[in-house]
Amino acid sequence: MKVLVVEPEKEPYVKEINSGLSSLQKEVGGFNEAVYPFEDPVAIICNEEGKLEGLPLNRALRDEDGHVYDIIAGTFLIAGLSEDNFCSLDDTQIEKFSAMYKNPELFMRFGSRTLVIPAEERAMPDKERKSMDMER
């Protein structure tokens, strides 16, 4: 089946995998958990114990207002849903979720709050950095 693989600090990519449990566990590095945060017929398949195992934080899950309600730790997959199982994503789904998770995210903890920063903002060309320093 054709899935989207989303690794920490990387852009998503499409991969063909077997639909069996062992293939899914291999991809996410442990026991898997499926979550269904979208209206689309897709699932996020992630490592059930990713946070407990200290896997790197990957991407935030947001509600319809854009507020973060959870963060996925470790590599996760996005797979299509059939009536009773996971299935291949179609091209429209691949395009939509590739764009949604294109930019890796960084996470910073401040007290009880966690800030989510798109990784693209982290890397600033030297010319821009010098320009900002001169403005101070």
PLM regions with names:
Residues 1-15, 19-125:
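N-terminal nucleophile
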Residues 126-136:
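Non-Sec secretion/translocation targeting segments of pathogen effectors
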